[in-house]
Each structure stands twice: as C-alpha cells, then as structure tokens.
Amino acid sequence: MTVYSYLVILFILLDNYCSAYGYGYSYYHRRHFDPAIASFTKEPYIGAVWFTQHGDYMYVNGSVAGLPPGKLLGTHVHRYGGLGNMCLEAGPHFNPFNQRHGPRHGYPRHAGDLGNIRVGRGGVAKFDFYVTIKGLGPFDGFIGRALVIHANRDDLGRNRDEGSRTTGNSGPRLACATIGFRAP
C-alpha cells in the first residue's frame, strides 16, 4: 500500500468517527448561519433587518420605521415565528441552552439577545452591529423565528429581579417579523 492509500483510509475513518459523534457536515451546517432577513410589513412598523454570519459573529443591519422617537428599545430573537396576538405567539426569547438574559456580547446570555437599538427623531431605528455567536455552541440559527422590538429599554439582565434575568424588563412587544432565508 502506498502512503496515499493510507491517507485515504485515515480520512475515511476520521470522517466516519466525526460523523458518528456529530462533528461532520451536520455540525458545520448547524454552526454556519445562512443569510437571513426579517421584513417588517405591518403598519406603522415598516422596514427590514438582515442577518449575515462573519466567522464567530453575526452582522445585523437594517432599519425599521414607525417606532417611538428618541427611545432605546430592547430587541430579541424569539423562539417561534408566530406574529399573532400582538407578537405574543413568538413565545419567549430564543434560549436553546437555558441561560440567563444578558448583553449581546456577554455570557451568559440567550442566543436571541440583541440588546438595545436607538430610535431617531423621525421614528426610525437603525440596526448596525455585530453579535457574538462564538461560545453559544451549535444550534439551528434564527430561521423561522421572530425578531421582536419591545416597548422599553433592555436592562441586559443586570438587575436582580426575575424579569431582568428572563426578558431584560423590555416591556410589551411593539413590532415583530418572522426571520426567513434571504435571496442570494
């Protein structure tokens, strides 16, 4: 047998081992987020927010109009994509690892914690930030879930009460949109 033959056998065995323990293609696929978009189309909230992975970070950019001017508003990805009943069908924050609520760059935190956005004088909020995804472990991403904009500022889980640890005391849900695959 040649060295090449041994290498081929080694790679086949390694691939089978990795696949058996969840580190093959399926692991990579769960770690890589396909480009996504959340389109806000229900008046008065109009806009779009894009999600694009860059290594260990998710770039979030876009804008939503029709929000209360001059406020900081909590934003989160919620577990479900349902938008009914004033966004309550979106369920709780996306939290596959049962962590405390926190800031978008801190740990522990929910996978769906996006922090606060500032609404300008004209009622338009601009999204333009990176979210750390390194260390969150493999999960199936944001596709099919809802992006929710809340009525209050997110306290980022810094208070000692239960509301802070679960929702950041962000208040009622103002606007929501289902996150779907983005066209190339």
From Swiss-Prot:
Quaternary structure (record): Homodimer.
Major localisation: secreted
Keyword Heme: no
GO cellular component, as recorded: extracellular region
Locations listed in the record: Secreted, Extracellular space
Glycosylation sites: 61
GO biological process: symbiont-mediated detoxification of host-generated reactive oxygen species
EC number: 1.15.1.1
Keyword NADP: no
Cited function: Destroys radicals which are normally produced within the cells and which are toxic to biological systems.
Domain of life, source organism: Eukaryota
Protein name: Extracellular superoxide dismutase [Cu-Zn]
Pfam families: Sod_Cu
Position of the signal peptide: 1-18
Cofactors demanded by this protein: Cu cation; Zn(2+)
Family: Belongs to the Cu-Zn superoxide dismutase family.
Organism whose genome encodes this protein: Schistosoma mansoni
Record text on cofactor binding: Binds 1 copper ion per subunit. Binds 1 zinc ion per subunit.
Top class in the EC scheme: oxidoreductase
A single GO molecular function term of this UniProt record: copper ion binding
Reaction(s) catalysed (UniProt annotation): 2 superoxide + 2 H(+) = H2O2 + O2
Residues that, per the record, bind Cu cation: 76, 78, 93, 150
Cysteines joined through disulfide linkages: 87-176
